[in-house]
Amino acid sequence: GSYLGNMALAGSMFDLRLYDRETHLQHQNNQEDGPNIWIINSYTRTKQDFSNDQIHGNANLYKLRMGTDLYNEVSNKGEQQLFGIMAAYGNGSQTTSARFANRDSKGSVDGFLLGVYGSWFENAHDRSGWYADTWFQYGWFDNEVNGAGLSKESYDTNGWGLSAEIGKSINYKETDRRTYSWQPKLQLTYTKLNNDTYTENNGSTIAFGNEANLQTRLGLRWLSEQNTASTKKDSFFAEVNWLHNSNNYTISSLGDSISQDGNKNLGELRLGYEKEFNKDWFISADLSGRFGSNSYSSFQGMLSLEYLF
């Protein structure tokens, strides 16, 4: 089960959305300024079963991601285009236990990713209207598995991911102090892990399957943003999403095959807050939870910082 858990941890390291790295507030000071640096810290705790509830798993994942815009320009029509580079480090650990046998195992993954991203906004001034975002990432992963009473197994893997996201911000109410908006959005993320068949120290072989996955995310975000002349604005948001994964990771060994359970279709709720400390510093924080079938659950806390030079 730990080999399968390591696949899930590696695949999760690619997760990234536009508004993970772009705050709603910073555009008011940085429509075409630069450069900037953004940093994202996140911690995720996941509970998941494998092979029709025969194996129980718990996983923890820490990710540190940072990047900078290399190009940021606003056209005469008020449209904004930006392009940047990013890097990420992830450290994950997980434990699995067999339901009807006294067998536990542990796994861990260290990952390093490099990537590029690009975004387009219809209205640079307040980010109303349409937007589009895309990114590409490539990652390298060091994996370990420790079975009870067995020697440690170590192996290397790699993978890549490609994403396209589109959405529209619709302002529906404006007061003297705040602007309220809805933002429907759609994101497609394709990831491909490359795991060679691995031979354990005892001679058993581990074959990895369903390494490619297309995740569809359809969601709606509600936003309340301060619109006064203050240089210390803030915003609140709530977001609901439906996520669909085309494949569940699988592994095969000694004629037996096991796969992920419960994450084919997921519901997600996110709540967040963004704050402008001054014209250069911005911070955002959010909490989210995902829920699926077969007792699948995942909870994440995220903290993002952005500095404008």
Where are the regions that the model predicts?
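Short linear motifs at secondary-structure transitions and domain/linker junctions
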Residues: 11-18, 42, 57-64, 92, ...
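Detector for outer-membrane/organellar transmembrane beta-barrel domains
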Residues: 152-252
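Residue-level signal for well-ordered alpha-helical segments
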Residues: 45, 95, 99, 143, ...
